[in-house]
Structure formats: C-alpha cells, structure tokens
Amino acid sequence: LTRSRGLGDVYKRQTLDWYQEALDAVSPENRLIPKPRWRIEHAQNILPEDQNRYSDMDIIASMQPSHAIGDLHFAHKRLGKDRLDNAYTWRNLIDLDVIVAGGSDAPVEIGDPRIEFKAAVSRTDLDGFYKDYWNLEQSVTREEALFMFTKWASYSVFEEDIVGTIEVGKLADLTIFSKDLMTIPEDEIMSSEVVMTIVGGKVIYER
C-alpha cells in the first residue's frame, strides 16, 4: 500500500507521473501485488486532463468531504475562480469508476461521520450555506457517500474481506443512528444521534 499526500494540482500531476513510471517499469505479472491500490490523499484539486489518469491507472482518490465545506468560504480566493471546477470533483471521479475513499482527517477536522456524510451529499456547510461557484453537481448520492466511508474505504487498505460491509464472516464494525441517514431530509442529518457503536462485535457505546 502506497499513499502520497499533497493538496495542489501540480503535486497530483507529479505523483501520477511517478506512479505511471513505476507501474510501467514492472509488468503486472512480475509485481508482488499485481494491482497495488496506490492512493493519493487529499485528492481535492485535480486538473481535468489528470482525472482520467486515476481511472486508467486504478489510483484511489482519498478525500475528506468536511474539507470541502470549510474551503468553500475561501477557495475562490486561494484557487481563483478558473480552477474551482477542479476542486473536490467527487462526481467526476466516481463516474470514471475511480474508487473514492472517504475520511475525516481527524484531528484536523472533528471526525464526526455525520458531518462527512452531509458534506458529501450536499456540498453545503452545516448551516446550509454555499456559493454558486461551488459546483453542487459534484455532490454524490447517499449510497455513494455510504460506500466512500465503508466499502470503498476498506478496499483502499486491502481490508474488504474483514470490514466495510455487514455480512457473515466479517467484523461487526458499525454505528447505529437514531434516524435513517439514507432517507431523511439533508437538514436532519446532523440531528441524528448515535444510538450504538459496535467494534469487532463488541458494543463500546450505547445510549
């Protein structure tokens, strides 16, 4: 598992170039791991011509939705409006069949899964604020948001056989909320409370 961390679009391009060079140097049949699942952390500013490369090389994009709803207040000043279309392109990447692994970046961010889920499906901050330039069409469906933090996240670290979905033979790692996050209105997501948390089949929190 190789993870590279960086925020800028030029960094992403350089990293993709290095990954491509490494992949080209050893044929799949001669690799210790034929499909290595390399991952770029904070894949939040990607040049349009580089987005296809994630798909072509099977590179995993690791993103933290809470960064997007914080950045929306100042990104137009840091990036410039011409580059905002390249920011947090979750929808584009998923449509290209790229695995998008979600996270919180705690303790930089709060680490509340409700915040990450809401940010992914709405791209608005916790007060519902957004700007027209923030490309709401790049939000994801609720099923995709769920996959980002479960199924796709476990795949990104080679743990899909033990966690990431609820099924026989896997560790029972799950949180139960007081409301159905898949169906309630967006403005109710943050009011949903944790009823129970189970880790490895053991109840570690119960309201």
Predicted regions and their residues:
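Single conserved hydrophobic/aromatic residue that forms the stacking wall/gate
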Residues: 1-7, 11
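His/Asp/Glu-enriched, well-ordered alpha-helical/loop segment
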Residues: 12-38, 42-43, 48-187, 192, ...
